[in-house]
Design a protein with these regions (language model features):
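Short pre-active-site segment immediately N-terminal to the catalytic Zn-binding motif
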Residues: 129, 176-190
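Active-site His/Glu-centered metal-binding helix of metallohydrolases
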Residues: 192-201, 255, 259
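A short alpha->loop->secondary-structure connector
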Residues: 171
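Hydrophobic alpha-helical transmembrane segments in multi-pass membrane proteins
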Residues: 216-222, 232
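Hydrophobic or amphipathic, alpha-helical segments that drive membrane association/targeting
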Residues: 2-167, 281-282, 334-338, 348-373, ...
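Pan-zinc metallopeptidase signature
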Residues: 266, 272-358, 362
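Catalytic Zn2+-binding segment of zinc metalloproteases
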Residues: 196-215, 224
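Short helix/loop segments within enzyme catalytic domains
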Residues: 130-133, 137, 141, 145-147, ...
């Protein structure tokens, strides 16, 4: 591959490529198979948006037909390295090296379509006219993480405290548990940002593989049926598949946590939502002794705790999760990207008041409330009494 100083992208997954890079580090496609000068994010045949949003109004950030997403800013792009946990990529490479898992993933991606997976969700699809406050919060999170297309969002009561990202190599969708819709503002943005991080990191396919191989049992473990059952030869064979999937699942959650943290940029919000989510209770987290919790966080790298997490959980333990988030907030990567995000998401300044030569502007001497007087009402008068319009003040001047 040759370059002329311009950025080039993988023709399959649109990852940024380095000069003379023989293959894409994200999807493994040889660069000779296709290099795109710019990442194409829309459908050129879309009659609604024209492909890259040219037919949409400036206020429309997502195409309802092809799901094209308007970038946060012109040429805005966020590399996956900005939030991906290093062990996450290593664990995915391990999964790809396991023949049965790779075969299952290829079969799932090639034969089981996304609509079939979506049909199994048993939920309500969100949109501009269906729970719009959640939908548009999801659109914002997707734009912050520079997704090219907007994933479908569903709300389901099947697993009320769960949040899933499923799909294949090319398309994904997100299922939000009904209880989690109680989150508002930055708390909801963090939750949705996590799921957009799963999409951006290519987790949807392997999440779907876990659904098919391991089922939907929460917190599946390789010793979940006891030590004697663990020593069963059939169980050992099953664990050979489960163990790498569980290891990847734990690392994938750290990547998602970092993506959500990058979306909101507020450590207190991240810690609160992770605590509420892990405990499956909103009020219980507020009753926790934070000093005692910090002691647990400091001890979370203990070898015995790490072994317990490895054998007993497909999600990271809360204390370790909080410690890793604390470390991420201290990195220059997060600080630098938050400066960029805040620059492009900052609300525009309020318009300056238009000067009207026929109006006298003054403030109440008691409460400071702004007042406006028409000059015509003062015509021929040297003095006039006016009353502050503030009901709580009412001072005569």
């Amino acid at each position: 591959m040759t370059t002329t100083g311009a950025i080039t992208y993988c023709g399959r997954c649109q990852e940024v490529l380095l000069a003379d890079q023989p293959f894409c580090t994200r999807c493994g496609t040889a660069t000779a198979a296709g290099v795109a000068a710019m990442p194409h994010t829309g459908d050129w045949n879309c009659v609604t948006c024209g492909g890259n949003g040219v037919k949409l109004t400036p206020k429309q950030n997502v195409c309802p037909t092809c799901r094209w997403l308007r970038p946060l800013a012109p040429d805005y792009y966020m590399p996956i390295e900005a939030f991906q946990w290093a062990f996450d990529q290593q664990a995915m490479d391990t999964l790809r090296s396991i023949g049965p898992l790779t075969a299952a993933a290829n079969a799932l991606s090639g034969r089981v379509s996304r609509p079939w997976l979506e049909a199994s969700v048993n939920g309500v699809r969100l949109g501009p006219d269906q729970l719009p406050e959640i939908f548009f919060a999801a659109v914002h999170s997707a734009r912050v993480l520079a997704l090219p297309r907007m994933p479908e969002i569903y709300v389901s009561g099947e697993q009320m405290w769960d949040c899933m990202t499923l799909g294949g190599d090319n398309e994904a969708f997100i299922v939000v548990g009904s209880v989690l819709t109680a989150l508002k503002g930055p708390d909801l943005a963090f939750l949705l940002g996590r799921q957009m991080g799963h999409v951006a990191a290519g987790h949807a396919l392997w999440k779907s593989v876990m659904q098919f191989i391991s089922g939907r049992a929460q917190n599946r473990t390789i010793m979940g049926q006891g030590v004697l059952q663990f020593l069963n030869p059939a169980k050992i064979l099953e664990s050979a598949i489960d163990a790498p999937l569980m290891a990847w699942a734990r690392h994938a959650e750290i990547t998602a946590d970092r993506a959500g943290a990058l979306t909101v940029g507020n450590k207190a919000v991240v810690r609160r939502v992770l605590g509420q989510w892990s405990l499956k209770s909103f009020p219980l987290y507020n009753r926790l002794n934070q000093a005692a919790l910090e002691r647990d966080v400091a001890m979370s790298d203990d070898s015995q705790i790490a072994l317990s997490e490895w054998t007993m959980s497909s999600t990271p333990y809360l204390a370790r999760r909080l410690r890793l988030i604390d470390e991420y907030f201290e990195t220059e990567t997060l600080k630098g990207w938050r400066a960029i995000i805040e620059h492009w998401t900052r609300p525009p300044p309020p318009p300056k008041p238009v000067h009207d030569p026929n109006v006298i502007r003054l403030n109440c001497v008691a409460c400071g409330n702004p007042m406006r007087l028409q000059k015509k009402d003062m015509a021929g008068k040297e003095k006039a009494k006016v009353k502050c319009p503030n009901d709580k003040c009412g001072k005569m001047m």
